[in-house]
Regions:
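Alpha-helical transmembrane segments and their immediate juxtamembrane cytosolic regions
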Residues: 2-343
């Protein structure tokens, strides 16, 4: 860790990865609990857009400067394949899910983000010559229009790549100094707390009516699939605006000083890859039923609270070792491996 480490961004990432885990845990029970629907919907309004914004914010050193660091593209793709293989092995051989298939470039589940990162890095490198405002506006337009194409879907996770690309661009182009100054405003922080409380109340008391729009939060499906073939573009634009608003709120209210959770924000990659297989295993082996036996009235609360120790355990440093090796690959090392294994 360097002396210039941005603890605020680490804290934000710690919060976001915790929300990722909570959101995926809640998704198992959205059909049986209105509270789970609320948790899922509110989290998905902003957690991936903000995560992707931060991904763009921190990717500048990879894209800018001299040689394009293609190793990052390769690293993310290797991690994507690794995650995909873990999921495939778990479903196919661990739990004998017969319809499980392995399609290298077709991904609609949790590993999609890692494949998208490889694509976004390439896109930003190719497109960075264009004016930022123009590129962001075009990307937003593309994100809205793509929903009208029912043929774009999980191949190369293309729908999500296009829908979430504006957030990646915003993170990449935002000026660091202005960004830090903006986040230091105490007045805006107070205003953000008010917006957060109002947003939570609005979503909570209207979840029965708005939950039907959950498909717009994932960026995966066409408007036809979401049963909004005409007004889908309007709803996506609304999602963009809400995502920006709540992401800004999150950035403003998270503390900038080092906390006990800061270290978690420095190890989000390993948590992202390992959490879903763990959650799936817990659910498969009747872990929720065990909580019911403890408290029939409060078992769902206990179930969600379990996400905290899951995040903490998965942030243990040794668990990140294989992923860190992959992320630190160097082109020279890759060429040596290739030369040792010629066709």
């Amino acid at each position: 860790m360097t002396l210039n480490r941005d603890f605020k961004m680490d804290n934000v990432k710690a919060l976001l990865i915790t929300l990722v885990v909570i959101g995926h845990m809640a998704d198992f029970y959205v059909n049986t609990s209105e509270n789970m629907k609320f948790i899922y919907f509110f989290i998905y309004l902003f957690h991936m857009p903000l995560f992707i914004f931060l991904s763009g914010y921190f990717i500048k050193s990879t894209v800018n400067g001299g040689r394009f660091k293609v190793e990052k593209v390769i690293s993310y793709f290797i991690l994507y394949l690794l995650f995909k293989l873990i999921m495939y092995a778990l479903f196919k051989y661990g739990f004998s899910v017969e319809e499980t298939n392995f399609n290298t470039f077709n991904e609609g589940n949790v590993p999609w983000y890692l494949l998208a990162m490889s694509i976004w890095i390439i896109l930003i490198y190719v497109l960075k010559q264009f004016k930022p405002v123009f590129l962001v506006l075009i990307s937003v337009l593309a994100g809205i229009v793509i929903g009208y194409d029912s043929f774009v879907g999980d191949y190369l996770t293309l729908s999500r790549v296009i829908v979430f690309f504006p957030f990646f661009l915003l993170g990449y182009y935002i000026d660091h100094n202005k960004f830090v100054t903006f986040l230091s405003s105490q007045k805006l922080r107070f205003f953000s707390l008010v917006v957060l409380i109002i947003s939570i109340l609005v979503v909570y008391f209207n979840i029965g009516n708005i939950y039907q729009f959950r498909g717009f939060l994932t960026g995966r499906n066409s408007y036809e699939v979401l049963k909004q073939p005409i007004y889908g573009g309007f709803y996506r634009m609304l999602f963009y605006l809400l995502a920006v608003l709540l992401s800004t709120v999150c950035l403003l209210i998270v503390p900038k000083s080092k906390t006990i959770f800061t270290i978690i924000g420095q190890r989000t990659l390993q948590i992202y890859i390992l959490h879903f297989p763990l959650i799936f295993i817990l659910n498969h082996f009747y872990f929720p039923e065990g909580l019911v036996s403890i408290s029939q009235q409060h078992w769902l609360k206990l179930y969600i609270l379990i996400s905290i120790p899951i995040v903490i355990v998965l942030s243990f440093k040794p668990l990140g070792w294989p992923f860190n090796i992959i992320m630190r690959l160097k082109l020279r090392g890759l060429l040596k491996i290739y030369n040792k294994n010629p066709d």
